[in-house]
A protein has these predicted regions:
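Membrane-lumen/periplasm interface segments of specific transmembrane helices
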Residues: 20, 199-236, 255-256, 288-290, ...
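Hydrophobic, aromatic-rich transmembrane alpha-helices
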Residues: 93, 252-275, 280-289, 314
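Transmembrane-helix signature of polytopic, membrane-embedded enzymes
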Residues: 95-117, 135-136, 152-155, 279
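Membrane-interface transmembrane helices that cradle and orient dolichyl/undecaprenyl
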Residues: 101, 105-106, 141-159, 191-192, ...
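Short acidic/glycine- and proline-prone juxtamembrane loop motifs at membrane-interface regions
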Residues: 126-134, 299-300
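Extracytoplasmic
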Residues: 174, 219, 338-463
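Hydrophobic/aromatic-rich transmembrane helices and adjacent perimembrane loops
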Residues: 176-177, 289-329
Length: 463
């Protein structure tokens, strides 16, 4: 009876999450990256290949994971968000899978409930970004590897390797690798596998990884992928950010901060708690935390990658601290009820107005003064994505990171403008204006409309 009640509660919660996620795909655009990726995907869909023509800052795993759903569901921002939302739902199922493998299904429900009370996580489940994908692929890799550790069937190891490769090639993520190695070490230490088994598994890992690279990554072009996504990250490392920027972000998410502090406190309170399976989750969570202290440039949306392992660790630690099962389940049910009500409230109270009045006005003007095949340029890429008037492929991403790191130089920008002769140039959020000598480029343009402040639309003279 208890099992049936648990399954019923979990299924109801997952269904509520699914339907509220579906409703929220029209939530207002707050992240400029959504416009960048929408514009990039539309250019790719028009036959301008990613990396070789269309600048694409994310590694190929992001495109491979989202683009099929983007096309299948309608080639819109909402279709991309829906695809991200479906991947996040798969991640929740992976959490439940892990909790069943570790014979503590209630920790899965607690983890899901807490995740949907943490803005750093749930905001990213419906944002056209790659951070939720990293967590989902790492969770699937962990679940498969735990399954392998129990039954030693090669299929589960291969599945785990595939997902860890997908996580790596989605954002060059290495945060789960130490946990992957630790699980194999524990199997060897417990004499469940031998040295020869380890060697064979390493060979399988290398073979699968090489095959993944040859089949999925190489076709995009090694040089092109390196220049667009890998080189940009090295250039962006020089970005100046405060040393403790991570803690500035955490101060704005009280629950996540409490969970991190609680996890660290409970882990250190009694060290013998840090044994299997806690040690594998602890390794993952701590490794992400350490990396994020030093990682640059670090943005608030990156916290989603930290949230998942920390919540998993906290949920497992709570099991060990509360020997009274009734109290433990009461706490879980309380978190579940709060999260359930929160999801309903957020879905009802969140506006379905995708863009602001100013952005809509700009899009209307863009459509009035340009044709569908005209080239336009804006640093507010949601305007290009939603209007269907796209920039030159090399300017699909006019991000502050590209400009500050000189990945997009003033000379290169000027050459692209001279060659493509865009009909409209729309400086909106200060990024275009931060390009050196940007005003000189506007000598061939006249002011068409002033939306407000620095939000202007310029049209090419003679058009």
């Amino acid at each position: 009876m208890k099992d049936k009640s648990f399954i019923l509660i979990t299924v109801i919660f997952l269904l509520v999450i699914f339907f509220t996620q579906f409703k929220l795909i029209n939530h207002p655009v707050k992240d400029n990256d959504e416009g960048i990726y929408l514009t990039s995907f539309l250019l790719v869909n028009k036959g301008r290949p990613a990396y070789k023509e269309t600048f694409f800052s994310q590694p190929p795993g992001f495109l491979l994971s989202i683009y099929p759903g983007f096309v299948l569901f309608g080639k819109t921002l909402q279709s991309a968000r829906l695809t991200v939302g479906l991947w996040s739902l798969i991640g929740l199922l992976a959490i439940m899978w892990i909790s069943f493998e570790l014979k503590n299904k209630w920790t899965g429900l607690l983890s899901i409930s807490l995740l949907f009370l943490i803005p750093s996580y749930y905001n990213q489940t419906l944002t056209f970004q790659s951070d939720i994908l990293i967590s989902t692929f790492s969770l699937l890799s962990m679940a498969s590897l735990i399954r392998f550790s129990k039954f030693r069937r090669l299929f589960w190891f291969i599945l785990s390797v595939l997902f860890i490769n997908l996580a790596f090639w989605t954002k060059l993520d290495i945060t789960f690798f130490p946990t992957f190695i630790l699980i194999l070490f524990l199997l060897f230490k417990e004499k469940k596998i031998s040295i020869s088994n380890i060697i064979n598994l390493i060979l399988v890992f290398l073979t699968i990884s090489l095959g993944f690279f040859l089949i999925f990554i190489l076709p995009f072009g090694i040089k092109e992928v390196f220049n667009d996504s890998i080189l940009l990250r090295f250039q962006a490392i020089t970005s100046s950010q405060p040393v403790l920027i991570l803690f500035d972000y955490l101060k704005k998410d009280a629950l996540l901060s409490l969970i991190i502090l609680g996890s660290l406190f409970l882990s250190l309170l009694k060290r013998n708690f840090i044994k299997y399976p806690l040690n594998i989750i602890f390794t993952w969570a701590i490794f992400v935390l350490i990396i994020f202290i030093f990682y640059r440039p670090l943005f608030p949306h990156h916290l989603a990658i930290l949230t998942v392992p920390m919540v998993l660790l906290f949920s497992q630690l709570i099991v060990y601290r509360f020997k009274n099962k009734k109290l433990y389940r009461f706490i879980i049910l309380a978190c579940f009820i709060i999260a359930f009500i929160s999801r309903i409230f957020i879905s009802i109270s969140t506006s379905s107005k995708l863009i602001s009045d100013q952005q809509q006005k700009a899009i209307d003007i863009i459509k009035e003064y340009s044709n569908i095949d005209d080239v336009i340029i804006s640093d507010e890429e949601i305007l290009t994505g939603l209007s269907g008037r796209l920039p030159p492929p090399a300017l699909s991403d006019i991000s502050q990171v590209r400009i500050n790191s000189n990945n997009l130089s003033a000379e290169e920008f000027k050459q692209i403008i001279a060659f493509n002769k865009p009909k409209l140039i729309i400086p909106w959020n200060g990024r275009l204006e931060s390009i050196r000598n940007f005003k000189d480029i506007l000598n061939n343009y006249r002011l068409l409309t002033k939306i407000s402040g620095s939000k202007n639309i310029y049209i090419r003279i003679g058009e």
